[in-house]
């Protein structure tokens, strides 16, 4: 059977089950149907063998069993499986959720970013359009308000012009594509910070929601609601556990219960699973509240620094305020992510309530029975510590002698496996204060010292019995975290594409399940340098380089050094010349001199028309 044919067979089985349930008034998801198909095949009481080809009768039997289980809406087992499928499909861990939000934002901005970075605008109209696209990109990236709001566009444009005027588009277009994308992200953060700072000062930003006040108002209510719901769920768990303990001890006063014990056990599983999901959700909400407190504190500090830096000076260097604006935008984006995370957790917690069937199974008399909490059970057996001498086949771990004892990866989600096997599927929380047993690199907790002794004597038998119980009760696989033990068989459609080719040439028949390839983590230590290093600098690995060197050596081997002399060789000689070195010299020249003598004053008289002019000497005598 080819891979396409095998996938078609599986789709046909799921489709037929879905149509049958739909005709009976139930609309079910394919994920739930696929999980139920696997649960039915793994149940040993149904006698399905994954090592042989399923016949038509086997396929028909499989469909009928799945339909019967899926149509039993009063079964706590079905409700628990629905709860598990719902939680797996809707809950996302914190880190994965934040990464997914970042990828969604990038995918939403990808087309705008490509349009901006690939633009070749030259005319004035094209540059104006490009600048408007950048404004739209910043609005979408910051997610502070709607891009259709005219005030938002004006505020964003004004903030962008203060840090990136349109005159800089030319230099922006000359950058590399990666540099353009980086500058777009930086400008988006700075513009977001400017708008948030203006809103904090009452200068615009009316369309921006006040996330800190919304979160401060919503978080306490969500935490209190989850704590109240968790307390109610815990009380139900304690009531079912106490009632099943009385039934397992064959108490004559309570042995005749109006509800079958198996149905009570399934209701206990339903409540315990709800409790586990609520604890996980509440832990994420508390972590979200702590992160919101930190982000708000950092945001207030940044706003104070910006206010002090801007209001006290007429001119502020951009290198001083731009990092603060970017930090404000980044902190606000963190608050938006926490808001989305809180919304997801709230929706998941509220969606779990529709799968609860535990309260309807208890009678008023059973509701009034004394409740013994998990803490009471642990305190009652705290003094009965496990003796090391009685558990020689297993290693004992105690709080005072084991590092990081509170974070040991306990098997079965911390429940006692011995009680599960010996007391008809009763779930009792393990008491780690009496000691934890380590068997084959795995840690086990027990409800009492006697249970620990029983496990140490037959550890392999009990672990196999727990897996057998989980195969008969599929909701325990996730509740006790046994998924890794049930990966030996998997649906064909879940195989990787590379592994599906291994089934080419299979014999005809509907082989629904295939054995998966076993995998395990392994490590090995090797010597880094087992031999002494000897690096040859003249080593050459290239064959053509070695050939070139060989030809060169062969040519040199046939060469002979020769000399020749021309007719003018005898005329060559060394030339020399002699010069006189410069030296300092001086000479004496004459100079002008003067003496004090009368100045000669001689003129002609009678030059104005008188007859006979004469020379008159008015010079003073030398001896005067």
From Swiss-Prot:
- The identity of this protein, by name, is Cilia- and flagella-associated protein 206
GO terms under biological process = axoneme assembly; cilium movement; regulation of cilium beat frequency; regulation of flagellated sperm motility; sperm axoneme assembly
* Origin: domain of life: Eukaryota
> Its principal location?
cytoplasm
A Pfam family matched by this chain, by name? FAP206
What does this gene product do? Essential for sperm motility and is involved in the regulation of the beating frequency of motile cilia on the epithelial cells of the respiratory tract. Required for the establishment of radial spokes in sperm flagella.
Give the keywords, sorted: Cell projection, Cilium, Cilium biogenesis/degradation, Cytoplasm, Cytoskeleton
Record-stated family: Belongs to the CFAP206 family.
Q: Which GO terms describe its cellular component?
A: axoneme; ciliary basal body; motile cilium; radial spoke
């Amino acid at each position: 059977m080819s891979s396409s044919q095998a996938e078609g067979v599986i789709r046909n089985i799921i489709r037929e089950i879905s149509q049958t349930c739909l005709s009976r008034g139930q609309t079910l998801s394919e994920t739930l149907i696929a999980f139920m198909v696997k649960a039915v095949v793994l149940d040993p009481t149904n006698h399905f063998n994954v090592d042989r080809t399923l016949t038509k009768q086997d396929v028909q039997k499989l469909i009928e069993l799945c339909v019967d289980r899926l149509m039993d809406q009063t079964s706590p087992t079905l409700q628990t499986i629905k709860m598990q499928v719902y939680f797996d499909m809707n809950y996302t861990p914190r880190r994965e959720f934040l990464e997914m939000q970042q990828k969604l934002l990038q995918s939403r901005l990808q087309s705008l970013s490509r349009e901006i970075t690939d633009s070749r605008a030259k005319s004035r109209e094209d540059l104006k359009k490009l600048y408007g696209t950048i404004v739209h990109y910043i609005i979408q990236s910051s997610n502070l308000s709607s891009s259709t709001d005219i005030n938002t566009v004006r505020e964003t444009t004004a903030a962008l012009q203060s840090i990136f005027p349109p005159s800089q588009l030319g230099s922006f277009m000359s950058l590399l594509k990666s540099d353009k994308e980086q500058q777009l992200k930086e400008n988006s953060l700075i513009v977001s910070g400017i708008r948030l700072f203006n809103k904090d000062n009452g200068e615009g930003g009316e369309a921006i929601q006040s996330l800190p006040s919304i979160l401060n108002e919503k978080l306490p209510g969500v935490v209190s609601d989850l704590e109240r719901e968790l307390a109610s769920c815990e009380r139900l768990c304690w009531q079912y556990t106490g009632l099943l303990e009385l039934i397992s001890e064959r108490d004559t006063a309570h042995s005749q219960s109006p509800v079958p014990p198996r149905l009570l056990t399934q209701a206990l599983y339903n409540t315990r699973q709800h409790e586990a999901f609520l604890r996980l959700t509440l832990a994420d909400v508390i972590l979200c509240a702590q992160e919101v407190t930190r982000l708000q504190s950092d945001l207030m500090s940044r706003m104070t620094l910006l206010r002090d830096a801007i209001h006290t000076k007429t001119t502020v260097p951009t290198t001083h305020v731009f990092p603060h604006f970017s930090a404000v935008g980044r902190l606000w984006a963190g608050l938006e992510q926490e808001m989305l995370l809180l919304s997801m957790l709230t929706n998941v917690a509220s969606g779990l309530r529709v799968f609860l069937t535990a309260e309807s199974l208890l009678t008023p008399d059973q509701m009034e029975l004394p409740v013994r909490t998990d803490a009471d059970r642990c305190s009652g057996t705290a003094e009965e510590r496990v003796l090391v001498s009685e558990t020689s086949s297993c290693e004992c771990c105690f709080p005072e002698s084991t590092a990081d004892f509170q974070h040991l990866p306990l098997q079965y989600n911390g429940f006692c496996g011995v009680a599960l096997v010996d007391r008809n599927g009763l779930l009792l929380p393990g008491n780690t204060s009496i000691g934890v047993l380590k068997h084959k690199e795995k840690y086990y907790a027990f409800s009492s010292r006697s249970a620990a002794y029983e496990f140490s004597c037959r550890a392999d038998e009990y672990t196999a019995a727990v897996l057998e119980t989980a195969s008969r009760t599929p909701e325990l696989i996730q509740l006790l975290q046994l998924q890794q033990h049930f990966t030996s068989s998997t649906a064909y459609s879940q195989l990787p594409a590379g592994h599906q080719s291994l089934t080419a040439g299979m014999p005809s028949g509907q082989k629904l399940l295939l054995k998966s390839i076993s995998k395990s983590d392994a490590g090995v230590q090797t010597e880094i340098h087992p031999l002494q290093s000897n690096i040859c600098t003249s080593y050459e690995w290239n064959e053509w380089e070695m050939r070139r060197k060989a030809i060169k050596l062969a040519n040199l081997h046939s060469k002979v050094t020769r000399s020749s002399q021309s007719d003018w060789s005898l005329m060559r000689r060394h030339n020399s010349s002699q010069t006189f070195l410069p030296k300092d010299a001086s000479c004496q020249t004459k100079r002008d001199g003067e003496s004090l003598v009368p100045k000669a004053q001689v003129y002609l008289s009678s030059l104005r028309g008188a007859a006979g002019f004469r020379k008159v000497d008015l010079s003073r005598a030398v001896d005067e």
